[in-house]
Structure formats: structure tokens, C-alpha cells
């Protein structure tokens, strides 16, 4: 963070101000971290985000999955409480309430990021931004001039080219995060971090889970 702040301070000396000294497209970990550091360094900053601050990691990735996993872990402990010499009446769960808790945790963290950006003078613009040229960004009907432009557009879901996949009602990770009904069984394509977190979560809820991974190891 100190290195980033020093970098922005050095850039500041070369500015011929044209509205904002720095425009950032994308409010994920890269974008909001850079915006906060630039704001602390005294630059005028505008940050564009078409969805929610925090990007995939906070809204649709590791933070919400770990929140779901924590609920599943507590449920597991309750089911097997006798192993720890603790008596618990019949354990149960409400997936709708688990999802609601996840959303509450995510919302709190998003608001925390927003508060830090505002505290450092960053102008947050919600909407899909388009680059007109190296010094111009358009969002909605408004045009923003900038001396420097930082692109932190993030990632999107990849649907593997499996024959017939377009004919079935499949989930992406986004659907799985907001699902409020427990399936009888689930096949997960991809044994990476997010895939295995979902596998662990649904397995804890009693779902029969199969993980398909093309590599030799998960």
C-alpha cells in the first residue's frame, strides 16, 4: 500500500488536470485498493462500478462461499455434538436463512469499502463505463475527463463447451450462491477452490455431490 501511494504521488507531479487525475473502471480488489491509495495520496479520483463494490471475490466468490461454509460447519458440529460430550436436540437448518445471512455479511463489507473510499475523497459512479479515448470515459449520459486511466474490469463466468450444456438448466456459481432449495444431488464441474467449497457446503447439507475435474488433482 505504501508503494502504491508513493507511485501516485510521483504521478501527481506530471498532471495537466482535466477533471479527474485518475479514473478507474472496476470496483473489485484491484480497483478499490488503487482508488483508496490514490485518494490518500491527494489525487482526484473517480471510480466506476456497474454492480457492487468488492468485485467477484467479495460479492460472488471467496467471501460468500466461506460465509456459507461457516454455517455448514456449525450445522456439522451440532449434528455430531455428542462426539464432544455435548447434547444438542435434533439439528436442522434453513437454507433460505443461511443465504440471507450470507447476503447480510457481504452487504456489510461492501458498505465498509464504500465508506473508506468516500473518506478518501473518491467519487463513486455506479454504471457501465465506456472508454472513449485515453482521457475520456463515458458512463450513462455523463462524460468524465481524466489524466490517467486504470482498467480493473475483473472476470466473468466461463461456461465450458460441453455438448448439450445449453439444453439443461445448469447453475453457475452465482446461482449456487443464491439458491434457497436443497437439491437431492449435484454435479460440480471444476475442482478448484470455489468448486470444492461448494462441494463441501452442499455435502454438509446432505446433498449427494460429484465433482468432475479434468486435471489429475483437485
Language-model segments: which ranges?
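Glycine-rich flavin
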Residues: 19-20, 36-43, 48-184, 215-218
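Beta1/beta-strand and adjacent pyrophosphate-binding region of the FAD-binding site
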Residues: 18-28, 184-189
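Extreme N-terminal leader/targeting segments of oxidoreductases
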Residues: 2-22, 40-43
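Rossmann-like NAD(P)H-binding beta-loop-alpha module
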Residues: 181-214
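Short glycine-rich, flexible loops that bind phosphorylated cofactors or substrates
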Residues: 32, 158-159, 195
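N-terminal Rossmann-like FAD-binding beta1-loop-alpha1 element of flavoenzymes
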Residues: 21-46, 198-203
Amino acid at each position: 500500500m505504501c508503494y502504491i501511494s508513493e507511485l501516485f504521488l510521483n504521478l501527481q507531479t506530471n498532471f495537466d488536470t482535466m477533471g479527474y487525475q485518475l479514473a478507474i473502471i472496476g470496483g473489485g480488489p484491484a480497483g478499490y485498493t488503487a482508488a483508496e491509495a490514490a485518494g490518500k495520496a491527494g489525487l482526484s479520483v473517480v471510480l466506476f462500478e456497474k454492480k457492487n463494490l468488492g468485485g467477484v471475490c467479495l460479492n460472488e466468490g471467496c467471501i460468500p462461499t466461506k460465509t456459507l461454509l461457516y454455517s455448514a460447519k456449525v450445522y456439522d458440529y451440532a449434528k455430531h455434538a455428542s462426539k464432544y460430550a455435548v447434547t444438542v436436540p435434533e439439528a436442522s437448518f434453513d437454507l433460505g436463512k443461511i443465504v440471507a445471512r450470507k447476503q447480510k455479511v457481504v452487504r456489510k463489507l461492501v458498505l465498509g469499502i464504500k465508506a473508506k473510499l468516500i473518506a478518501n475523497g473518491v467519487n463513486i459512479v455506479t454504471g457501465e463505463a465506456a472508454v472513449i479515448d485515453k482521457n475520456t470515459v463515458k458512463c450513462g449520459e455523463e462524460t468524465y475527463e481524466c489524466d490517467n486511466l486504470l482498467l480493473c474490469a475483473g472476470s466473468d463466468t466461463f461456461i465450458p463447451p460441453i455438448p448439450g450444456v445449453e439444453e439443461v438448466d445448469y447453475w453457475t456459481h452465482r446461482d449456487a450462491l443464491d439458491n434457497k432449495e436443497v437439491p437431492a444431488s449435484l454435479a460440480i464441474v471444476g475442482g478448484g477452490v470455489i468448486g470444492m467449497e461448494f462441494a463441501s457446503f452442499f455435502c454438509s447439507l446432505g446433498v449427494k455431490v460429484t465433482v468432475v475435474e479434468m486435471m489429475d488433482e483437485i
